[in-house]
Amino acid sequence: MKTPKNDVYTVSRLNGEVRQLLEGQLGRIWLNAEISNFAAPGSGHWYLTLKDNFSQIRCAMFKGRNQAVTFRPANGQQVLVKGNISVYEPRGDYQLLIESMLPAGDGLLAQQYEALKMKLAAEGLFASDTKRPLPANIQKIGVVTSPTGAAIRDILHVLARRDSSIEVIIYPTPVQGSDAAKSICDAINLANSRAEVDVLLVTRGGGSLEDLWSFNDEGLAHTIYNSGIPVVSAVGHEVDMTISDYVADLRAPTPSAGAELLSKDADNKAQKLLSQLSRLKQAWQHYQLKKQSQVQTIEHRLQKQDPQRRLQMYEQSFDEMQLRLQQAMQTKLHAYALKQQNLSSRLANQSPQHRLTLEAQRLSYLSAKLNDAMDDKLKMSEQRLAHRAQQLDTVSPLATLSRGYSITLTGSGKVVQAPSDTCVGDTLTTRLRDGSVTSTVVEVS
């Protein structure tokens, strides 16, 4: 049988082409699974297995990615991960390189939220050029919210404090539950049909991601976008960002902040600046969404020729060798521990008490000898110090002054040694034993 020359693969070439094929065909995927065999070596990378009832896959999450994870993964935990299928070429194992990880419950909602946000951004619902300016002189505000919630009380309190002349019309609707999104849409449509207010404030107080989920509805997004009345979205707290915040003409971080935006105040310039900043933020967020999509496309193209991928492969290999070394060291230490126990048992049968007594006596003798030597050394040092101090005192200028002499200095601090060192009019300082005398030169001879 002839051996083919052109179609013979090496193992490295085969694994490399399999990796490129998997990465090119599947790309980035989401996976919902249970964690097992979780390991976090000193390199900072994470290695784990994701499994369900029938299958499992090895995974790696490198340090630059896992630093963004807000919880500590544990075996048995259900998670939602996003990553890329790849092949660890040295072993020929295919694995998932994880980019992000969320707890399964919050993760599914977050995935739906991100998918809808990308879709609506692509449709242009977040574009800054579609945002309508708020009326310059607002007389009536329509509030779409629950009539019994804390949000409406905060809004009415702020409006009463800032501008009691503004009329408020409440379009009551539930803001939480399976039917809440449709009810909010109906309230917005009702306000548009009546055309009785200058602006709509769609709002509710804070809550969990599930509590705010009605404001992440696609139908509600289109209703806000198609509203003939400008819409301000003020949902939850400042850290909460819902789809309604992105599509509204203006976003306020809280219900109270929404009321402040829509009411007059002596500091009108600050209100305008806040509005401009909010629009700038929305434009920046829209720009980020657009660029994020472009970056993801470029990342996918670069994955096949990413030098960091090869570095990560070597790091993964190093981590595996490190784990094996740790296991070998633990086995060796256990063997040494058993040997030490055996030696200790044998030593206990041959008491070294006599030798310890001799060594204790020797130690006491050496300690006393060391103390004597230290005392002798200290006395010699004190004598040398006293001798040096006497020598310094002999040549010290201060000793000369104490014997009745004086030293005259020029204004620059130079010692006057001859008449030529001074000029008429110079100020001189004469140092005496108990002080100094300042004088002026009137004649030099």
From Swiss-Prot:
InterPro entries, per database record: Exonuc_VII_L, Exonuc_VII_lsu_C, OB-fold_nuc-bd_dom
GO term, biological process aspect, one: DNA catabolic process
Subcellular location: Cytoplasm
Top-level class of the enzyme under EC nomenclature: hydrolase
GO cellular component, one term: cytoplasm
Transmembrane domains' residue ranges: none
Oligomeric form and interacting partners: Heterooligomer composed of large and small subunits.
UniProt protein name: Exodeoxyribonuclease 7 large subunit
Gene that produces this protein: xseA
